[in-house]
Regions:
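Active-site neighborhood of glycoside hydrolase catalytic domains
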Residues: 163-190, 194-216
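N-terminal catalytic cores of secreted or lumenal carbohydrate-active enzymes
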Residues: 10-185
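Extended, charge-biased low-complexity segments
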Residues: 2-5
Length: 216
């Protein structure tokens, strides 16, 4: 049977080993040594407001904070698997997508210029301390013209062939444009919280719709 250890961090010291708290009663958790899944890593989400907050610090403090989060040093958190939004999430400075030109099925107006202001430099700074940092990306909302109704904060993807193809191409363009910036997107997730109709950017999907979109 494997021993379970309690690890915690405080502002004064990280990765401390805690002393188990005694409690009455018998534990009903039994570990049999069988492993079903592999944990690839831990991390957080890159977003615009996070980068704006980081920039309020002096440059040396920014570097120190990023090192504490991402470096492989014994005293760092060693974050190595993070996520990021495709377009706006609930921590964007305001709502946007990477192509808000209605009817642009060829994505001629697709652009990551806005991401070059915050998200891309944020990720690049983190990668100076974690060169092998893995990223997965997901949209909170498609471009509004691809949705019914055409708004960021709720609704569904218009289920028409040309619209579905354009949205698939949207993901491909995103990955390729980030690759041009030296950033590899390791995974794409089709939708953040697909069953949540939120007051911030969101889009509802059924399981059948996700299956069909990913398959086709």
């Amino acid at each position: 049977m494997k021993e379970i250890q309690w690890r915690y961090s405080t502002p004064e010291a990280v990765w401390q080993t805690g002393t188990p708290i005694s409690a009455k009663g018998k534990a009903n958790l039994r570990l049999n040594g069988v492993e079903y899944q592999k944990m690839f890593g831990f991390g957080g989400c890159f977003n615009e407001q996070g980068y704006e907050a980081l920039k309020t610090l002096p440059e040396n403090k920014q570097d120190s904070l990023l090192k504490e989060l991402f470096a492989a040093d014994a005293e760092a958190c060693k974050l190595n698997f993070c996520r990021m939004p495709i377009g706006a999430n609930d921590y964007a400075m305001d709502w946007y997508s990477l192509d808000e030109t209605p009817g642009d099925y060829a994505l001629q107006h697709f652009s990551i210029d806005r991401d070059k202001e915050r998200l891309i430099p944020y990720i690049q700074k983190a990668k100076t301390y974690a060169p092998d940092l893995k990223l997965f990306a997901s949209p909170w909302s498609p471009p509004t013209w691809m949705k019914n109704p055409p708004v960021y904060n709720w609704g569904k993807l218009i289920w028409e062939p040309k619209n579905l193809q354009a949205y698939a191409d949207y993901f491909v363009r995103f990955v390729k444009e980030y690759q041009h910036e030296g950033i590899t997107i390791d995974q794409i997730h089709v939708q953040n919280e697909p069953v949540a109709n939120q007051k911030f950017p969101s889009c509802m999907w059924t399981g059948a719709e996700l299956k069909e979109f990913i398959r086709d």
